[in-house]
């Protein structure tokens, strides 16, 4: 597992070196990799003589990168259909630490008498595990003396226009910014874990996932610095940018700038009794920013809505909640949560996990893997093939890369973020992403070798033909699990990055070997594989009180233990163990123990299993005898034994 935080220079352009050259020559920088011509605007060669490239100093006598800091109003969409990026930039203004990462050394880049002007700027975007520094000149496309694309409402502030230009360079040209993915833009400007929630699906899949839970989850993520953008999906091309009666726009993205709960006084209950007893109710609100800088929600809790009269000025001031300016249609508005989930269909958020061990707030364990789906030049399904496709392709599915991890406790939460490499960085021609996803299954407690026959999945991510997919696992039983990242179809080859975040450390490692070598010198090949499933025990009569019981499974060399469970007469484990052998007849011993905590553990009973390699799955019930030889119950077991060591 490797991780590199070193910044990569896009096009091998070094900002410091180029800036020194420009200052020495007393000439402002002109970027030859992204020239101020139609070549940088369009996918194909076009004539557009009315577009003039101008530097900020030609557009305003007192240009600045920032004017009084950054705010959502600094980012207003131009004629380019790139609300996905503009909304992400608007969301970025709520996380100053990230903004400083994307726009490094802003003070040194600012127009100032303290240092020479060189017409060169740098920005950073997160790509495939590294921050990529993109250098640009400050020549911006204009028409009739006005910026064509992103701009600030403050006429002499230019950070948003310059940031958009750097992003266009990363994507090959400005036209490539039309109609992108919200989650990609959020990830590019944050390096966080991107996830898109489909509101209807989220509320429908699990009846326990209510609107309130979604609100609380979103508020928690936002308060921790997550970047959040919401959108209303358009079903057809004709519906894109269609305005609804409520003021919202279909096929359009809005940056989320606040998520909060306020107290609202009931205007009909303002008597002395209600004052003493309390007549307030809670109202969940969300604040959004339209990148157009206009067109707002006009329903309850909109700018000039009467609902604001029922909220005290002191509460608004204390909570930092202020109704948007009712005197202008600036694209900034509040709306009630219940209306938000009614109209908005998708929520894209990019979470930033705290991985510092010195933090007082909750921190996460982070593990990162770089690998690839590749056939290794082999036929599909060959042992070294690592591009097997999804579970639909059963013959090759298990050929994919495999990663094993242990859940140490039932309260452990694990998040997986799978990202594929973008081969089109900086190119006009965009190669389509392959469809990717993740598949998780529970495996034997002692498995150390690759799975060859898929077991029942306990979780499957959405499959998406985008840059990344996300999977969150909660409340899994303690045990060993296998993660298989896949493309949808076999033989699809590309690099991928896998990030794992957990609130407890989990041992996460790749499985590369098919079977062990046996014998003293480790030179014998395994001839068979056996899976033993210990389901549970039933005692003939209930003893007094509840006992904590576990089982130990032994072969001639090793022993393995189940978890400890409490019970009176019956104990159910349903735990599996795997054995590779060089003999066709195998013997195993099962011991049932009482976990006495404060004293030495007590052997309750034992039994012996004779496993024949018969290529069958056999359920069997064995008698349990205590140390004196008395039968005191039974243990139920499934024996799956095969003469192909690479069968299971």
UniProtKB/Swiss-Prot annotation:
Gene Ontology process terms (BP): cell differentiation; female germ-line sex determination; feminization of hermaphrodite soma; hermaphrodite somatic sex determination; membrane protein intracellular domain proteolysis; programmed cell death; protein autoprocessing; proteolysis
Keywords: Autocatalytic cleavage, Calcium, Differentiation, Hydrolase, Necrosis, Protease, Sexual differentiation, Thiol protease
Protein name: Calpain-5
Similarity field: Belongs to the peptidase C2 family.
Cofactor binding note from Swiss-Prot or TrEMBL: Binds 3 Ca(2+) ions.
Function: Required for the correct female sexual development of the soma and germline in hermaphrodite animals, while being fully dispensable in males. Has calcium-dependent proteolytic activity and is involved in the cleavage of tra-2, for which it acts as a potentiator. Capable of calcium-dependent autolysis. Part of the necrosis cell death pathway. Required for necrosis of intestinal cells induced by B.thuringiensis endotoxin Cry6Aa.
Source species taxonomy: Eukaryota, Metazoa, Ecdysozoa, Nematoda, Chromadorea
Gene Ontology MF terms: calcium-dependent cysteine-type endopeptidase activity; cysteine-type endopeptidase activity
Region listing for Domain III, in residue ranges: 354-509
Keyword Cell membrane: no
Pfam families xrefs: C2, Calpain_III, Peptidase_C2
Tissue localization of expression: Expressed in neuronal, but not in GABA-ergic neurons, intestinal, hypodermal and excretory tissues.
Cofactor section: Ca(2+)
GO cellular component: cytoplasm; membrane
